[in-house]
């Protein structure tokens, strides 16, 4: 592990200047690997890499009587979401006390975060906050409360925020954004208190202290009061929602909560799978906190019909749920450029069939299936290559799978404008998501962008992907590389789906159109 120089580290704010994976590895694995007995260090590294299966497998190799095992078991239990059991195990550890103390601190932090409830106690369905009358003499002023943002994080979540606020500005809404307390300094970046990205104002709540929810809510209320906002609009997760709710109730403002995903289910898919993780303390608490914020909101926005159904199953009244699906900016509907010319421009062989994904690289995306499908298709005689454009926590895993011949390439993170170039260079865009509760419910942004560029989309056959594409795609069973390889051989037979998909996006998925729903939702909160 390469460490940064101390002067640079101190100048950038100590450990906050490191990326999150770097900080975790320094915290969990630094100095713990014993070359004579590497097993404890390997367990620490598995925990640092968020690899529960590997951590549990290695832990099982340790003798029960090994005095080092309790602290390691505590770390693995914490990773598995069993917060109380982890803390108990850590307190019983007689060796590895530094590791045990880290577990206890982290368990306390999680318990504080997951134990928080909206001010005034848990909201009952239908309970509302009295709000002040809206101002009639000037444009509606909305403050969006988000977890992360451009330019520091580029993902579907941050691109959606940028697109929504840009559209609202053109519609006469005075919309601004504030990011979570401590962002982006806690992620290792230095930032001003306000940054502007293409006319969108991002306020930063910088803090040298931890992101306590009550402190977050108080700082948020101060900013909202200073900006004289009319509506507080928070987006996933419950920490944002809880803080915005504190501020809204303090100021008498309407509170809108936008459910962009189910983060507890995303976590579950990485930590033992849906069935096992759903019974853990962390999952249950996170789901309860999310539900409480949904029930307390004056209006709830979400992305898809399946997600709306899930909200209703939690007790949210259907007439308070508003759908704002993912859309595309107008430049995605510019004329499509010649694919052969774009292949040359992007360094790809123009005669070869090129497919790929433009995505954040998470395990949910199922990219190993794409790599294997290309291998199978090439073994069957198809001259096909794949490009993976993006970055993320699963990138190292994907890189290990890439062949040495350059037929599958991982490009890394690119600017949004370059993402459009890559779409135009591909013959088909593949969305090989795994089958899990979260992928069945949550609709991603990237397939809509691909259709806007008239690209054939080949996607896992999941309800969320059928809705996200309007059915204008080819569908294969998740995790079935052989079936995907067969679809790759038939790309030329189905290019018309991309053309039809572009027409559908033009009609129904422009940001400037889908974002008009927000005005109706805001107006509804003012009438409560």
Question: What spans do the regions from the language model cover?
Answer:
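Nucleotide-activated donor-binding/catalytic signature segment of Leloir-type glycosyltransferases, i.e.
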Residues: 395-420
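N-terminal subdomain of nucleotide-sugar transferases
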Residues: 1-37, 107-201
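Nucleotide-sugar-dependent
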Residues: 365, 415-421, 431-447, 459-467
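Carbohydrate-associated surface elements
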Residues: 181, 306, 327
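A short, well-ordered alpha-helix in the C-terminal region of glycosyltransferases
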Residues: 495-508
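Conserved donor-binding/catalytic core segment of Leloir-type glycosyltransferases
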Residues: 142-144, 337, 349-375
